[in-house]
């Protein structure tokens, strides 16, 4: 469990998952089989895809991701850590089809997610890959009530869902996120940042994904709220047997959440290792520098 700044253990604030949720979810046992594979992924942003301001500074193309390869196994949490501009979010967007890779191969469950023309084949994942974004307010439609935000992916991926089943699924998802059902008839601007992120989590779970990509999901939140959201994600992963790709520049959070960690710098992988091994015995100089920059609590006399 995570500890709050005052030294108290922060317990999970998620609702207990009901038998109905477990029964209808179709829980898969963790097999430790390869779920995701990136092979020599490269992304180059040329002068047509970078901002005008960037062009004034430097007209050269930007290689955001450079020959990145790694595997993600079912049931684990893999961390991507690095400073801003290291390529973490670009990798996440490539996996979810928001950005096309310039080169390389991406496989999900042994199927290629990009065809020969680098077009994303959503039919291969069908909602099994979902993403939780850094800013929950920007990722939620301000014109939709919470009920509609959560129901939208359900209606998209389950064309023949009945109204009763839709309503029950929305109730289940808001329960999982630890929110009250009364919140379903309110708009995003009526909630705090932590509550909005809970709504984002409920929406991401609507398609019953196998892989959840968390792109700095707590960096915009207060420290105590961060711990609650992290515990919520860990509880959900344990109960629903999800696989996670967790992206952050916050090393203590990465250490707490992840089984393995990949360190990125300028779009290149510097080091990959088990979490505790990486922190206790870092090999790459950049990894050592990041760890040395971690805030340390000095003894108070």
Predicted features by range, described:
Residues 187-191, 195:
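Conserved ABC ATPase signature
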Residues 96:
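Helix-to-loop junction immediately C-terminal to a conserved catalytic motif
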Residues 269-273:
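ABC ATPase "signature
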Residues 208:
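Conserved catalytic motifs of ABC-family nucleotide-binding domains
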Residues 164-182, 291-292:
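Conserved ABC ATPase "signature" region
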Residues 254-256:
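A short, surface-exposed alpha-helical micro-motif characterized by mixed small hydrophobic
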Residues 104-114, 125:
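Conserved ABC transporter NBD signature motif
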């Amino acid at each position: 469990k995570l500890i709050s700044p005052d030294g108290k253990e922060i317990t999970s604030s998620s609702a207990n998952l009901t038998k109905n949720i477990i029964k209808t979810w179709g829980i898969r046992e963790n097999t430790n089989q390869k779920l995701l594979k990136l092979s020599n992924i490269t992304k180059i942003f040329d002068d047509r895809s970078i901002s005008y301001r960037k062009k004034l500074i430097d007209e050269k193309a930007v290689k955001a991701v450079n020959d990145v390869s790694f595997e993600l196994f079912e049931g684990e949490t893999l961390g991507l850590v690095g400073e801003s501009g290291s390529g973490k979010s670009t990798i996440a967007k490539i996996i979810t089809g928001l950005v096309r890779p310039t080169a390389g191969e991406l496989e999900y469950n042994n199927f290629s997610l990009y065809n020969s023309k680098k077009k994303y084949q959503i039919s291969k994942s069908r909602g099994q890959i979902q993403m939780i974004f850094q800013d929950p307010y920007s990722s939620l439609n301000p014109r939709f009530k919470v009920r509609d935000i959560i129901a939208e992916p359900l209606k998209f991926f389950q064309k023949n869902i009945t109204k009763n089943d839709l309503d029950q699924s929305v109730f289940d998802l808001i329960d999982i996120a630890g929110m009250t059902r009364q919140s379903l008839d309110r708009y995003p601007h009526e909630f705090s940042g932590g509550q909005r992120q809970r709504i984002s989590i409920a929406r991401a779970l609507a398609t019953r994904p196998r892989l959840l990509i968390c792109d700095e999901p707590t960096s915009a939140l207060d420290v105590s709220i961060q711990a609650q959201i992290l515990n919520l994600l860990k509880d959900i992963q344990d109960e629903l047997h999800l696989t996670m790709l967790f992206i952050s520049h916050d090393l203590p959070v990465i250490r707490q959440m992840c089984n393995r960690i990949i360190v990125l710098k300028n779009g290149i992988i510097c080091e990959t290792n088990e979490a505790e091994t990486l922190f206790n015995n870092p090999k790459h100089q950049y990894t050592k520098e990041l760890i040395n920059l971690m805030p340390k609590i000095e003894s108070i006399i």
